[in-house]
């Protein structure tokens, strides 16, 4: 199955869930930030994806932790995480797939 951008979706059984404990980067410091929490968290998630894709720790089509897991770990609302994910989805780092979760995408192939 492909989406509107031409990404091929693997079968659900082929997808690997990335646990919150798998994240190799330190959590962001959300105190004294100049931008919104959503943008700061979005940039942090994008940096984590870039770093861990390059190192091979995560792979394309990995399912990132749930919004609730991120919100709990970062001490913010699920809405803040939802906005952060929307921000990085627009940049091509992830793609939300209903009934599956949010998948890591190859951000280097964006036009």
Task: Pin down the residues of each PLM region.
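Extreme N-terminal segment that seeds HTH/winged-HTH DNA-binding domains in transcriptional regulators
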Residues: 2-79, 83-95, 100, 106-111
